[in-house]
Amino acid sequence: MLTKKQLDLLEFIHKRVQRDGVPPSFDEMKEALDLRSKSGIHRLITALEERGFIRRLAHRARAIEIVKLPETLGGAARGGFTPRVIEGDKPDAPLPAGAQAVSSADAVALPLVGRIAAGLPIEAINQNSASVAVPGQMLSGKGDHYALEVKGDSMIDAGINDGDVVVIRETSVADNGDIVVALIEDHEATLKRYMRKGSSIALEAANPAYETRVFTEDKVKVQGKLVGLIRTY
């Protein structure tokens, strides 16, 4: 039987994965549960893992997959933290739980418009030279969609690795905690977690090696919101 804190954390992780496709950061978990330190989150995660509700994925910093949910949260897990679509050239290799295969029947071709920095600045997005197939159900919400190749490791704790392809829905607005494509001062594009703090906008990395960058709101334009991720094995 889970304690209230364990249940609250499991529900928070599940809702964030369902909404964003990626788990919350440890800081976000700490804030959501009103805990004073990350050590409390570590203890709760360990307890959930020991009870078989979650598992931490190897070689992915702090990446969490929900294995099951208690009946109070809807029973069986409806998808944990795994890439929403997997492509690869090893047909006999097992796919992670919850991964979706792309078939020609339901695939949609999106423009791969360039590279996005999950680390140091690289370039703004403006190179439409290729396309990538994604499942149609990934394209939710209003607005056009496009794909970007990730360069850098600043978002690894959110499960976004160097070389991944992210699927972005075009939008100019974002809620706190969204992972967005942000254009800084009209020339630098970056993939970061969006946090508005008064009249300032903080672009937070998901890697402790990178500092949070804070700008006045006139310096940052939201170009899109993360809705999916493609990883090649």
UniProtKB/Swiss-Prot annotation:
PANTHER family listed in its UniProt record: LEXA REPRESSOR, LEXA REPRESSOR-RELATED
Protein name: LexA repressor
Annotated family: Belongs to the peptidase S24 family.
Catalysed reactions, as listed in the record: Hydrolysis of Ala-|-Gly bond in repressor LexA
EC identifiers of the protein: 3.4.21.88
DNA-binding region: 26-46
Stored NCBIfam families: lexA (TIGR00498)
Pfam families per the UniProt record, alphabetical: LexA_DNA_bind, Peptidase_S24
Record-linked InterPro entries: LexA (IPR006200), LexA-like (IPR039418), LexA/Signal_pep-like_sf (IPR036286), LexA_DNA-bd_dom (IPR006199), LexA_repressor (IPR050077), Peptidase_S24_LexA (IPR006197), Peptidase_S24_S26A/B/C (IPR015927), WH-like_DNA-bd_sf (IPR036388)
Enzyme class: hydrolase
SUPFAM superfamilies tied to this protein: LexA/Signal peptidase, Winged helix' DNA-binding domain
A molecular function GO annotation: serine-type endopeptidase activity
Subunit structure: Homodimer.
Organism annotation: Roseobacter denitrificans (strain ATCC 33942 / OCh 114) (Erythrobacter sp. (strain OCh 114))
Active site residues according to the UniProt entry: 154 (for autocatalytic cleavage activity), 192 (for autocatalytic cleavage activity)
Record-annotated site: Cleavage: 118-119
Function, in words: Represses a number of genes involved in the response to DNA damage (SOS response), including recA and lexA. In the presence of single-stranded DNA, RecA interacts with LexA causing an autocatalytic cleavage which disrupts the DNA-binding part of LexA, leading to derepression of the SOS regulon and eventually DNA repair.
Alphabetically ordered keywords of this record: Autocatalytic cleavage, DNA damage, DNA repair, DNA replication, DNA-binding, Hydrolase, Repressor, SOS response, Transcription, Transcription regulation
